[in-house]
UniProtKB/Swiss-Prot annotation:
Catalytic reaction list: L-methionine + ATP + H2O = S-adenosyl-L-methionine + phosphate + diphosphate
Top EC class, one word: transferase
SUPFAM superfamilies assigned to the protein according to its UniProt record, in alphabetical order: S-adenosylmethionine synthetase
Chain positions recorded as L-methionine binding sites: E55, Q98, D247, K278
Annotated residues for binding of K(+): E42
Species this protein is from: Clostridium botulinum (strain Alaska E43 / Type E3)
UniProt protein name: S-adenosylmethionine synthase
Keyword presence, Heme: no
Amino acid sequence: MKRLFTSESVTEGHPDKMCDQISDAILDAILAKDSNARVACETCTTTGLVMVMGEISTNCYVDIPKVVRETVREIGYDRAKYGFDCDTCSVMTTIDEQSADIAMGVDEALESKKGQKDEVEAVGAGDQGMMFGFATNETDAYMPLPIYMAHKLSRRLTEVRKDGTLDYLRPDGKTQVTVEYENNKPKRIDTIVISTQHGEEVSLETIEKDIKEHVINAVVPAELLDAETRYFINPTGRFVVGGPQGDSGLTGRKIIVDTYGGYGRHGGGAFSGKDSTKVDRSAAYAARWVAKNLVAAGIADKLEIQLAYAIGVAKPVSIEIETFGTGKMPEDKIVEIVEKVFDLRPGAIIRDLDLRKPIFKQTAAYGHFGRTDLDLPWERLNKIEEIKKYI
């Protein structure tokens, strides 16, 4: 049976991704000085303006406008002709402390209040909600091929812009990859869509030629392309106005790009700007860690895990496994293995994945999972042997 599946990615200059990076840059700047800070930092941007808002409880000082401007400069919006200038844009901040009612449940979990005096039990989930983790063995990164290739294309777009290979490119851009599957195995790439912001002086013909040569052919394996593969490069014909000048941006509006490209389910909670007591982030990272190690251990070819939490309670209220018919054992038995091998209380996740460190800004563009260019704790295959003891 043949089917098509599509995923998209965006470059770091996309306005929503700008906001994710700004929020995580602020988070990292605070964690570098105060590893126990509570941060929920949201950013929005539009023409000539960045606004940072949220709840932050910390004993340190961070120059937020400076962090904002440095981040925007790194992305590449450093002159007016790009539609946004890091030095002249307005930066507004409106920050409050974390709600005392929320802090009460995070500082001391329900289990701890009931006498279970354990350092890990002391940290309650920062909110209710469900989080999903996913892994598949169809790529070496244990990621679905559509999102994996879309990210590679968007990263390459940024590389050729920053290294001067295609110096007429501007920071904003999007990629999309459609993969044809046969019998649930990726067979070929059916369609590639790339939209990239550019200077006024360059022709569409030049852009099409250069993108195929320096972006697509540089990162997409030739065996995945054939004479029937379709290419849509700047299909509107012009993309000069981009970034915050073209669209407003907001933290947390690219949650499918951040995860599995729609191939796996999503609980709805965004990642960027949140410290690790927020299970939206830490439990989603843990879920990926669990799923990847289970697939690498041979328990399934494709696996999704759902975790769910209650605010102020340490232990997950539920754990569910789905193997899509690829499992080598019943799913309830896999749940039992997960409970034996992994401690999924927020305090344990923070400890085991070392999530009090300022490591988050680097994840805020090009995906939080399957990052072969980074050494992220939740991507490590360090539980395989322990899992195999129970198979």
